[in-house]
Amino acid sequence: MSNYDVFNGDADGILAWHQLRLTHPRDATIVTGVKRDVGLVSRVNAGDGDMVTVMDISHAKNRKDVQRLLDSGAIVEYFDHHDPSELIAHPNITYHINTEPNISTGLIVNSHVKGKNCLWSIATAFGDNHMELATNMAKAEGLDDEQILLLKQIGLTVNYNSYGQTVDDLFYSPEEIAKAVKACGSDIFRFTEQSDIFSTLLKNFSNDMSSAVCQEPYSISDNGVIYKLPNESWTHRVMGSFSNHLVSTNKDLACAIAVLNSDETYRISVRSSLNNPHGAGDLCKKFGGGGREKAAGINNLPDSELEEFKEEFEEAF
């Protein structure tokens, strides 16, 4: 029998995976990738009795391959917070899905493991921009301000490192981050001491954010703003973090960051406003993307559709 752990290469995917495996250890083949590489289940060839755990990637985007695994006799467990579309009725699949706006996969796992090693889930909440929720959870655990800041920085920087057209845009591959996280055991603060990974991410996160806030908006409306950025490694890395920064600094604001791809299409990151955290996923679905009510994206929007996207964005928000 073989085991497979399939998870998004962002903070939510990696840290949720680690928290789960701290409580339920299992040797498994790791399958992960950059944040927008959502079709990860397609890489798994599991057979009868094999166990596949999937975390923080859209069921809607992987349903066909999940069905393939079930048809082959595999046993699947699925943790996620994205819109799943149609679930599969099968005795060999167990779903842990919650699509509420203020939830992360890490928080779903935290509930599943009854709060064991919960600091990892707090970092996922910080990474997914649930700042108030994460801070309140950290305070409830008795953490001081310095520890809370470190948890926030871990969540933000690991999430930041996941964005890129390819792994070449990142400072560390998701596999390298997962290995460093696993080496921490139950102590999340050991991540700050893992070689130079944390310091490198923190320094470059700060540099890229400084570059982003100097950019001029492409479009401004009453309740939203759109930025259009060039095809550079730093723009791909920072787009999600910059999106979260914009909506955090104005809780009535929705935003979209459109970054030019190498094929002249646009990769787009959308955030609904924090005071009305709805609509991002539905907007992106209209253009072949997907996501959650609060945060969503499009991988390849043709330049010819950018104006239509702008109009739909303004109508949605």
Identify the meaning behind each predicted range.
Residues V34, A123, I148, F171, ...:
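Low-complexity, intrinsically disordered regions enriched in charged/polar residues
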Residues R43-N45, I88-H90, H96, N136, ...:
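Extended interaction regions within the primary functional domain
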Residues A46, D71, K114, A125, ...:
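Generic surface-pattern signal
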Residues H59, S162-E175, E193-N207, R237-S243:
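Short N-terminal helix-initiation segments at or just after the protein's N-terminus
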Residues T99-E100, A180-Y227:
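Oxyanion-binding "anion nests"
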Residues H130-L133, N161, I188, E216-N223, ...:
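Short secondary-structure junctions and interdomain/linker hinges
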Residues A134-C184:
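Loop-centered beta-sheet repeat module
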